[in-house]
C-alpha cells in the first residue's frame, strides 16, 4: 500500500510485471539499454533466470552473479530494478555467507556505481556476444572486497573489545566479580565497540 501511494505511476501494470517498454538512460539522457519486451518475454526470461539460480551444478556465487545480471538486463519493472536486484543479491549472499558481508556488497555497488554499470556495459557489448564472464568476475570481486573489508573491520573491533574488556576487569571501582554487573558491563562494552549507535536504556 505504501508503494502504491508513493509511486503509483510505476506500478506493474501487466499480469505480473510491466506491460509497456522501458528505457534505461544515462545522465545525458542517452538510451543505454532497453528492457525486455513484451511481458510474455519478461516472464519467459525470468523463469530462465530462476532456473539458473536454482541449478546446483553451477557454483552458488556464480549463480547469484548471473541472476543479478539477468534481473538488471530484463528490467521487469518500470522503476526500482537496481534496488530490487541489490536487495535480492544481498539476501542470497546473507543465506550462504554472512549478513554483514551481504550488506557491504550492496554498499560497495552503490559507492562504485560507475564500475558497477561498466560491468553491465561490457557484458552487453556486441563484441562479447553474450559472454557473462565480465559480470561474473566483477561481481565476485565485489564479494571478495566486501569479505576482506568485513573481516578486517571485525578483527580490529574484536581486538579493541578484548583490550577494553581486560582494562575493565582490572578496574578496582567496578564490581566485576558480581556476575550481573559484569554481564551488564560486557554488553555495554560490546555495544560501544560493535554498534554505531551504542546502546540505550
What are the residue ranges of the model-derived segments?
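FIC/Doc superfamily catalytic core
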Residues: 1-201
Amino acid at each position: 500500500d505504501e508503494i502504491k501511494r508513493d509511486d503509483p505511476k510505476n506500478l506493474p501494470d501487466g499480469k505480473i510485471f510491466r506491460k509497456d517498454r522501458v528505457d534505461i538512460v544515462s545522465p545525458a539522457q542517452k538510451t543505454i539499454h532497453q528492457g525486455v519486451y513484451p511481458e510474455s518475454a519478461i516472464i519467459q526470461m525470468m523463469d530462465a533466470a530462476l532456473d539458473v539460480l536454482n541449478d546446483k551444478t553451477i557454483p552458488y556465487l556464480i549463480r547469484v552473479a548471473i541472476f543479478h545480471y539477468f534481473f538488471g538486463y530484463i528490467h521487469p519493472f518500470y522503476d526500482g530494478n537496481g534496488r530490487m536486484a541489490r536487495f535480492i543479491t544481498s539476501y542470497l549472499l546473507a543465506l550462504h555467507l554472512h549478513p554483514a558481508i551481504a550488506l557491504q556488497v550492496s554498499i560497495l555497488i552503490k559507492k562504485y556505481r560507475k564500475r558497477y554499470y561498466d560491468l553491465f556495459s561490457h557484458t552487453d557489448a556486441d563484441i562479447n556476444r553474450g559472454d557473462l564472464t565480465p559480470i561474473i568476475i566483477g561481481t565476485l570481486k565485489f564479494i571478495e572486497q566486501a569479505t576482506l573489508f568485513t573481516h578486517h573491520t571485525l578483527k580490529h573491533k574484536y581486538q579493541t573489545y578484548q583490550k577494553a574488556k581486560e582494562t575493565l576487569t582490572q578496574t578496582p571501582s567496578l564490581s566485576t566479580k558480581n556476575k550481573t554487573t559484569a554481564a551488564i558491563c560486557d554488553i555495554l562494552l560490546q555495544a560501544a565497540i560493535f554498534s554505531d549507535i551504542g546502546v540505550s536504556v
